[in-house]
């Protein structure tokens, strides 16, 4: 299975903020959308960073309430690790596990195509495992 399969199922909608927005504004977006990370896009819609709950936590740990006034650019993770739609789900799982992150933007030739989360990957893998188990059950039954 490939990243393109996940995007084909879940869609390619991306939630993004700008580098100039405040951390408070980005937190409001995360909360309203009930998500754990937002992509950071510049005025040309180019991916320049990713802002995760962990990034926010580290900023608040360092600056307390003052962190809320920081610009997203001061807190975001950059450079961004990305994946390609032709990458396998197994490869993406390995990237996420080794990098200790839960969201990967999907990019091809500098064009942002979507984002996959660890939840998307785990769900896809569980569904795949269930399908394999059903095929084996049917094979054994015949």
Question: Which functions belong to the PLM regions below?
Answer:
Residues 1-29, 35, 40-43, 47-48, ...:
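Bateman/CBS regulatory modules and CBS-like beta-alpha motifs in cytosolic regions of diverse proteins
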Residues 22, 56, 88, 117, ...:
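Residue-level recognition of oxygen-bearing side chains
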Residues 122-142:
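Juxtadomain coupling helices with adjacent low-complexity linkers
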């Amino acid at each position: 299975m490939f990243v393109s399969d996940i995007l084909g199922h879940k869609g390619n909608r991306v939630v993004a903020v700008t580098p100039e927005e405040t951390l408070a504004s980005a937190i409001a977006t995360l909360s309203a959308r009930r998500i754990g990370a937002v992509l950071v896009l510049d005025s040309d819609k180019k991916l320049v960073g990713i802002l995760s709950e962990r990034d926010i936590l580290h900023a608040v740990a360092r600056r307390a309430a003052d962190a809320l006034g920081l610009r997203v650019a001061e807190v975001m993770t950059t450079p961004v690790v990305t994946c390609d739609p032709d990458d396998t789900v197994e490869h993406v799982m390995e990237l996420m596990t080794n990098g200790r992150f839960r969201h990967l933007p999907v990019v091809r030739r500098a064009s942002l195509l979507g984002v996959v989360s660890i939840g998307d990957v785990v769900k896809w893998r569980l569904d795949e495992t269930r399908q394999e188990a059903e095929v084996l059950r049917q094979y054994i039954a015949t």
